[in-house]
């Protein structure tokens, strides 16, 4: 009896082994060539790459950081037995002395504000006086149906 060669199962194993080696040689899926591999997907190599590299937080977070920090809310700082104090505790529509650092209005505007505030409580409508420039100006021309047609 002579030596036999490899059987039909051996050639199938060799083919399977060769196929597995070829699969190992294939490259892994890669990202696009113009994107950084070690950064989030919105950091590109394009014209905004330098600007985007510093934005690692969400836009909502850095917008919130840009706003000035608000103090505690008025209703959070007072107990039930403690009356509120300070300018934020006053009602904005209630009359009272203005703070010393409040800007003063010109006398004409001040009287108009006081009259308007008084008429708001009584329900009387108040209109502002016309400006002196409007009194001396010519009346505006009336627009009729003929003004919309062409003068042919």
UniProtKB/Swiss-Prot annotation:
It comes from the Eukaryota. Residues 1-32 form the signal peptide. It comes from Sus scrofa. This is Neuropeptide W. The lineage of its organism: Eukaryota, Metazoa, Chordata, Craniata, Vertebrata. The keyword Signal applies. It is found in: Secreted. Pfam families: NPBW. The gene is NPW. Belongs to the neuropeptide B/W family.
């Amino acid at each position: 009896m002579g030596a036999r060669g490899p059987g039909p199962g051996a050639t199938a194993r060799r083919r399977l082994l060769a196929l597995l080696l070829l699969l190992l040689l294939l490259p892994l899926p890669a990202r696009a060539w113009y994107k950084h591999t070690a950064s989030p997907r919105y950091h590109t190599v394009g014209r905004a790459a330098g600007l985007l590299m510093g934005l690692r937080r969400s836009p909502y977070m850095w917008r919130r950081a840009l706003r000035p920090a608000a103090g505690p809310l008025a209703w959070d700082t007072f107990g039930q037995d403690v009356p509120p104090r300070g300018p934020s505790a006053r009602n904005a529509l209630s009359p009272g002395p203005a703070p010393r650092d409040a800007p003063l209005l010109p006398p004409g505007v001040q009287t108009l504000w006081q009259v308007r505030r008084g008429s708001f409580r009584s329900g009387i409508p108040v209109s502002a006086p016309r400006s002196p420039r409007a009194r001396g100006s010519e009346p505006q021309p009336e627009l009729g149906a003929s003004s919309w047609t062409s003068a042919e």
